[in-house]
Amino acid sequence: MALNLCTSPKWIGTTVFDSASSSKPSLASSFSTTSFSSSILCSKRVGLQRLSLRRSISVSVRSSLETAGPTVTVGKVTEVNKDTFWPIVNAAGDKTVVLDMFTKWCGPCKVIAPLYEELSQKYLDVVFLKLDCNQDNKSLAKELGIKVVPTFKILKDNKIVKEVTGAKFDDLVAAIDTVRSS
């Protein structure tokens, strides 16, 4: 049995068993297509005719890296963009989601950023996101109705339920507690 592997970083492993050997299955770590081909040579007693059979099977395996959406780490703030924001919010389901809408040039945004990071470590049942309201994400910022930075949007069940504008840490904590307890 011949085994041909084509490598590609977007395809990831499968277990392959070579029936020609008695070895255990092995793990092929990176591949896009696996082709198995086997030749069977049979001889009949009458006339010693030979039969050649060739069979090819192509198997494609999708990587969980390609099919999975953006990931969020508990206890960390995840930076999102216009393409990743809604998939993460949808995946959060009924969890509370807090979005920090900031810009890199905003002084109050820089002041509250480390405190926001601490909140993500305190509230492990809440998803903490941040969105840089630059030109690339302008459409999402407009969709979410941003007027000033920083603005914190608190979402539950894919809907904005609270908003805190400005670097008002105590107001943000109170809003998060209110939404979590509802």
Curated annotation (Swiss-Prot):
Pfam families noted in UniProt: Thioredoxin
| Keyword terms, alphabetized | Chloroplast, Disulfide bond, Electron transport, Plastid, Redox-active center, Transit peptide, Transport
The annotated active site, in chain numbering, is: 106, 109
- Give the range of the organelle targeting sequence: 1-69
Task: Give me the disulphide-bonded residues.
Answer: 106-109
Q: Locate the Thioredoxin domain: which residues?
A: 70-181
Spell out the GO cellular component terms annotated for this protein, sorted alphabetically and separated by semicolons.
chloroplast
Q: Where is this site: Contributes to redox potential value?
A: 107-108
Q: Where in the cell is it found?
A: Plastid, Chloroplast
Record site feature (Deprotonates C-terminal active site Cys), residues? 100
Q: Does the entry feature the keyword Chloroplast, yes or no? A: yes
**What domain of life does the UniProt record list for this protein's source?**
Eukaryota
> How does it associate, per the subunit comment?
Forms a complex with heterodimeric ferredoxin-thioredoxin reductase (FTR) and ferredoxin.
Entry's family note: Belongs to the thioredoxin family. Plant F-type subfamily.
What PANTHER family does the record tag this protein with? THIOREDOXIN-LIKE PROTEIN 1
General function of this protein: Participates in various redox reactions through the reversible oxidation of the active center dithiol to a disulfide. The F form is known to activate a number of enzymes of the photosynthetic carbon cycle.
Q: What is this protein called?
A: Thioredoxin F-type, chloroplastic
What organism is the protein native to?
Pisum sativum
